Each structure stands twice: as structure tokens, then as C-alpha cells.
């Protein structure tokens, strides 16, 4: 890795409709082939569907869903001697949010609904109610970390 200066963090501007950075970041993650307006349309539609079903503010629902997906621990490979250990480490706050968003989008795309809007709405609702594939992924990640707790002293 280069030992030069640290790369400056790009500032993501708040999203135009809800004025929220989390929504803007999620739009960027959903975006495919640079089609931002399509990604925005899909997310805004999903948030509308979800807010109608739950009768709450869309951004509040989204943030609660992401909180239910955020992992606290994960495992990282660490080579010691001739063997590789899966060492449990705490996840940085920024990475927690980023992983939660990526998992939300990934597992939304794997769903069987017809449109991307419906897929996203379904996954956000499931995460809000603490079920669904993205929440299961978080549980599996935590189980892996718990199972490898014996190697926690190899942390760096």
C-alpha cells in the first residue's frame, strides 16, 4: 500500500427530495450504469410504498431498517504461523452503515417481486420488522464472530 497522504473523503450531498445523506448514499449504491434518476425513482417509490403501509415518515422507517441490519462484529482473516484464523473484530461506524446498505440492496435484488421498487420496499419492510435476508446476513455474521471468539486475542 502506498505510504503517501490519506485520500480525501468525498462529501455526499443530501438528497434533493428528503434532504438526507443516508438516502443519497443509498441512491448511489442502487445506481447502475450511472443512471441516477432511475435509482432515485426506484428508491422514492419504495419509500412511498413503505410509508403507506407503516404510516410513518419514510426516512425514519429507512433508518430503523438500516439499524436492524447494521453488524456490530465481523470476522477478518489473520495469518498466524502456518494457519489462517478468522478473528472477530468490531465494525467501524462508517462501515456498519455501508455494509447495511449494500446488504439491503443485494438481498432486495434477490427477491422475487416484479419491479425493483417492490423488491426494495419488501426488503426495507422486512428489515424494519427484524426479518428478511439482510437481517439474517447480520445474524450469520454475528454467529461467525461469536464462534471464533477464541481467536479474539489475535486482534490488531
Curated annotation (Swiss-Prot):
Please list the GO terms describing molecular function.
Answer: rRNA binding; structural constituent of ribosome; tRNA binding
CDD domains, sorted: uS7_Bacteria
Q: Name one Pfam family in it.
A: Ribosomal_S7
Q: Say which family it is in.
A: Belongs to the universal ribosomal protein uS7 family.
HAMAP family tied to this protein: Ribosomal_uS7_B (MF_00480_B)
Q: How does it assemble?
A: Part of the 30S ribosomal subunit. Contacts proteins S9 and S11.
UniProt protein name: Small ribosomal subunit protein uS7
Tell me which species this is from. Geotalea daltonii (strain DSM 22248 / JCM 15807 / FRC-32)
Its lineage opens with: Bacteria, Pseudomonadati, Thermodesulfobacteriota, Desulfuromonadia, Geobacterales
- Name of the gene encoding the protein in the UniProt record: rpsG
Amino acid at each position: 500500500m502506498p505510504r503517501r497522504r490519506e485520500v480525501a473523503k468525498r462529501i455526499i450531498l443530501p438528497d434533493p427530495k428528503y434532504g438526507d445523506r443516508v438516502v443519497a448514499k443509498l441512491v448511489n449504491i442502487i445506481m447502475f450504469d450511472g443512471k441516477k434518476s432511475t435509482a432515485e425513482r426506484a428508491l422514492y417509490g419504495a419509500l412511498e410504498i413503505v410509508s403507506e403501509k407503516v404510516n410513518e415518515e419514510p426516512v425514519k422507517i429507512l433508518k430503523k431498517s438500516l439499524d436492524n441490519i447494521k453488524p456490530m462484529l465481523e470476522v477478518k482473516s489473520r495469518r498466524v504461523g502456518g494457519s489462517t484464523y478468522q478473528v472477530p473484530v468490531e465494525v467501524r461506524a462508517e462501515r456498519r452503515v455501508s455494509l447495511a446498505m449494500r446488504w439491503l440492496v443485494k438481498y432486495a435484488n434477490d427477491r422475487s417481486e416484479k419491479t425493483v421498487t417492490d423488491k426494495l420496499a419488501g426488503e426495507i419492510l422486512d428489515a424494519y420488522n427484524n426479518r428478511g435476508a439482510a437481517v439474517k446476513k447480520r445474524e450469520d455474521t454475528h454467529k461467525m464472530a461469536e464462534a471464533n471468539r477464541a481467536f479474539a486475542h489475535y486482534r490488531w
